[in-house]
């Protein structure tokens, strides 16, 4: 009958690639049972991510240990950016608490579980695991990198959501004043955030002839057309000699408007095909869509004058009238909730009372009476 398997030797050997890794060499009286169990003892303070969006210290948090052990391995700056979650199951030597036993080769969770008296020396736990959360950036350089999309790899979601929230508004206001044609600035404007529209309204009031102001007008109409009208008014008021402003701010008398109709339908500065809509107020833009332009060519082969009268024949009626520009759209107006007035409620109450009065009268039972014979002499 063979002798029992006994443990004769325990030796701790350091790892080679990582100083945190160690080997526990177990020597038995039968060499075939010898094992080298690899484990780790964490000693680093993390200031980097072990993988994108997470930090996983080599520490096994066993029952009875405070979670503060996990947070002690990350720098204070990261402590504000990451949250601790339930990590993967792990095993740790009780006589070296926090050590992380690697599962590899023959050493598996099942192998440890099947070892006799293993629970006397090995405890189960969960590995420390941190994941990144949304947080407010504390320094201007980080805000600049995230909001200008220079480097968004480590940006929290609230600073990397295509400008859907207000977190980048302050930075983009200053950034876009210096570079209004920047694609990121135009993307911020397309999100239709009011700080963006207000910023571009101020910029275009000085530089309405810039190309990005055409995009600005296209974006804000029809719902926020006042931002564009304000910019056009200020620009044209400061540049009255600019021919582009002659439709919005015509320097001559209004006699043409009186006899020929709205100048957006006949004035060259308004009707030319090359005209950009940004040079029209919103109401002029709407008006121009209602103008009908009729163009024709008249060829006169002969002209006969009789008593200062001339008769010309043209084929203008054969052409189809072309409607002007596409309508810029109607702004969304929220209807106010109409509450019933006291007068209406009082009238309704009186009518209901009268109806109930007549119903009560006609619903009463008829009183039985005796017939009385009256004789007249």
Swiss-Prot record:
GO terms for cellular component: membrane; viral envelope; virion membrane. The keyword NADP does not apply. It is found in: Virion membrane. It is a single-pass type II membrane protein. The lineage of its organism: Viruses, Varidnaviria, Bamfordvirae, Nucleocytoviricota, Pokkesviricetes. Most cysteines are linked by disulfide bonds. They are created by the viral disulfide bond formation pathway, a poxvirus-specific redox pathway that operates on the cytoplasmic side of the MV membranes. Part of a stable entry-fusion complex (EFC) which is at least composed of proteins A16, A21, A28, G3, G9, H2, J5, and L5. Formation of the viral membrane is necessary for the assembly of the complex. Interacts with G9. The chain crosses the membrane at residues 342-362. Envelope protein part of the entry-fusion complex responsible for the virus membrane fusion with host cell membrane during virus entry. Also plays a role in cell-cell fusion (syncytium formation). Disulfide bonds: none annotated. Belongs to the poxviridae A16/G9/J5 family. GO terms for biological process: membrane fusion involved in viral entry into host cell; symbiont entry into host cell. The keyword Disulfide bond applies. This is Virion membrane protein A16. Induction: Expressed in the late phase of the viral replicative cycle. Residues 2-341 are virion surface. Residues 363-377 are intravirion. Keywords: Disulfide bond, Fusion of virus membrane with host membrane, Late protein, Lipoprotein, Membrane, Myristate, Signal-anchor, Transmembrane, Transmembrane helix, Viral envelope protein, Viral penetration into host cytoplasm, Virion, Virus entry into host cell.
